A protein has these predicted regions:
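N-terminal pre-domain segments of enzymes
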Residues: 1-51, 59
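Stable alpha-helical elements in mature extracytoplasmic
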Residues: 3-10, 53-60, 82, 144-152, ...
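Sequence-level motif detector for i,i+2 pairs with an aromatic at +2
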Residues: 9, 33-38, 69, 84-86, ...
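Sec/Tat-exported extracytoplasmic proteins
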Residues: 15-18, 22, 65-68, 156-160
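Surface-exposed patches in mature extracellular/periplasmic domains of secreted proteins
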Residues: 22-27, 71-78, 162-167
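A non-catalytic alpha/beta surface segment that caps or lines the substrate-entry region
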Residues: 49-96, 101
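Active-site/substrate-binding loop(s) of hydrolase catalytic cores
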Residues: 92-97, 102-219
Length: 219
């Protein structure tokens, strides 16, 4: 793939320790059809002093899915306690996504081995594809993963290296951009407040949501 050299320079600039840099992340592929996070959001993932609200995470994934047949977006029928959307993103090659219902069926059958003979299980395993689930921000102070997952989804959708092509061909990647959407946005609020008000006290813990101090949407 051609490289986005300007984005690659930002990766080098923003990476704080050399041991974080590997050949998998020290560059960004360039696409004339599929937008990078910077093209949609106006800044590169990992930009210092910048966190992204869930609505903007979702805006990026929707544009990614609109531009790439390797990406699909699903939204849960239920909203969070505070009324926010809850999104799931899938990345795989086009052939796998075309057979998504079949792969879901196989995975569901394999989940209960009591109903399968060994031979049936082996047949299903040979036909099926594993689902790999990456979730961001299980706890709201975990601020990095929702940012990073946007870049990971873009890499998986665009890059044509043998390593990435092998991933797309042989598995279906599920991404939850932010598992704890309410706390994520409140954490971004808090971070922006502290940036704008250096030295002032942090808002009290009651600021955090409708449950006692912490809402993980898991009750």
């Amino acid at each position: 793939s051609p490289l986005d050299t300007a984005y690659g320079a930002k990766i080098a600039e923003y990476t704080t320790e050399k041991y974080f840099m590997t050949e998998l992340v020290d560059h960004l592929p360039l696409s004339d059809k599929v937008p990078s996070p910077q093209k949609v959001l106006g800044y590169a993932v990992g930009t210092p002093n910048k966190l992204t609200y869930t609505k903007d995470l979702y805006r990026y994934y929707r544009e990614l899915a609109a531009a790439s047949p390797r990406v699909r977006v699903f939204v849960a029928p239920e909203k969070s306690e505070e009324g926010r959307e809850q999104m799931l993103v899938l990345v795989s090659d086009e052939a796998n996504l075309a057979k998504l219902d079949r792969y879901k069926e196989i995975t569901a059958k394999l989940a209960d081995p009591r109903k399968l003979s060994d031979a049936e299980a082996h047949t299903l395993i040979a036909e099926g594809k594993p689902f790999y689930w990456a979730s961001g921000s299980i706890h709201s102070p975990e601020t990095g993963s929702p940012e990073m997952l946007m870049e990971m989804a873009y890499r998986l959708a665009v890059e044509d290296s043998p390593f990435i092509e092998d991933i797309r061909k042989n598995m279906i990647i599920m991404i939850t951009p932010a598992l704890e959407v309410d706390g994520r946005d409140r954490m971004v609020d808090l971070y922006n407040y502290r940036k704008a008000n250096p030295g002032k006290p942090t808002p009290p813990l009651l600021y955090w949501g409708k449950y006692v101090a912490h809402d993980n949407n898991r009750d």
